[in-house]
Amino acid sequence: MYRRLLRPALFRLDPEDAHHLTLRALGLASAVPAWPSLVRRLTAPTDLRLTQTLWGRTFSSPLGLAAGLDKNGEAVPAFGALGFGFVEVGTVTPRAQPGNARPRLFRLPSDEALINRMGFNNAGAEALQGQLAAHFARPVPVWVNIGKNKVTPNEEAVQDYREAVRVLQAVADAFVVNVSSPNTPGLRALQAAGDLAALVRAVLDEVEAGRVRTLSRPPVLVKLAPDLHPADFEASVGAVLEAGADGLIIGNTTLRREGLTHPRRGETGGLSGRPLTARSTELVRAAYRLTRGRMPIVGVGGIFTAEDAYAKIRAGARLVEVYTALIYEGPGLPARLNRDLARLLARDGVRHLTEAVGVDL
């Protein structure tokens, strides 16, 4: 139904207008008390082979919603009802900012991809805190992706990340330190090993300082870009590990454009979707080797099928996330991926998802 009816209608709209319309509808659905729980009864993953516990939290599925789709936490209950094992909101900055000028989001249907140059448009940490506090009954863990404001120089970036943690710690089940978006000038420079280690330590210190006040100690993950030179990637992974972070997300959008066919392939911004499938899996495998399996890895990039997700798990990911595929495949995608992933495990005689992690090294 989505591919035949809804997607053609949405794809006639400007991509960002379609995004806002969809979020508004899901936000309204989230406000209906019985709707999310009713839908989740139909879509929630039930195969125990997919369930795992990480950082003291239970994930009913390894499949999560990646950051960027629900920046301000407007539709968390609705996304949780679709069959995701967790939902990542943001990127959020301490202070609200409008992001880059429109148009800033582009579909590339022939490549099953998106290009965005959004620029961390969001309502700010205080607004997100209010939204998440209102969703007191959460069907799944909610992660918060944090970044620095555009006007904040890199030398002061640490304070922005710390401020975001202070405001949001009580409502975050995990923090994701975003230093890899290509759409905020200078942000990716924070991936340099020395700067990254200092930033991660500062965020961990802030989380520890807020532990008594919030009665929570959310894990801290770091999201890296897929465009790093191999030596820089190795140094950044080492810095994250040495600083004591709790996990890695591999990776963000790419500036590469190899193999694209759509006329809008030259738009400035980060590319996501099908063109990243192989590259992101390769980087998950590299990160798993570098960490020797000591740090949970979340694989992101080009996941459209259960086979795509399974490949990342076998490369070393404990969890995976989707975004672009949801735009192309629709709201039935999470439940379908969960069912198909369980079938793949059964086909291979895998008793539990964790047995498949890293087997393809």
UniProtKB/Swiss-Prot annotation:
Catalytic activity: (S)-dihydroorotate + a quinone = orotate + a quinol
Active-site residues from the entry: 181 (nucleophile)
Pfam families for the chain: DHO_dh (PF01180)
PROSITE patterns: DHODEHASE_1, DHODEHASE_2
Any single GO BP term: 'de novo' UMP biosynthetic process
Entry keyword set: Cell membrane, Flavoprotein, FMN, Membrane, Oxidoreductase, Pyrimidine biosynthesis
Amino-acid positions noted as binding substrate in the UniProt annotation, renumbered to this chain: 71, 116-120, 178, 183, 252-253
InterPro entries tied to this protein: Aldolase_TIM, DHO_dehydrogenase, Dihydroorotate_DH_2, Dihydroorotate_DH_cat, Dihydroorotate_DH_CS
Cofactor(s) this protein cannot do without: FMN
EC numbers: 1.3.5.2
Metabolic or biological pathway, per its Swiss-Prot or TrEMBL entry: Pyrimidine metabolism; UMP biosynthesis via de novo pathway; orotate from (S)-dihydroorotate (quinone route): step 1/1
Class of enzymatic activity (EC top level): oxidoreductase
Locations listed in the record: Cell membrane
UniProt family annotation: Belongs to the dihydroorotate dehydrogenase family. Type 2 subfamily.
Record's subunit section: Monomer.
Protein task: Catalyzes the conversion of dihydroorotate to orotate with quinone as electron acceptor.
UniProt name for this protein: Dihydroorotate dehydrogenase (quinone)
Organism of derivation: Deinococcus geothermalis (strain DSM 11300 / CIP 105573 / AG-3a)
Gene behind the chain: pyrD
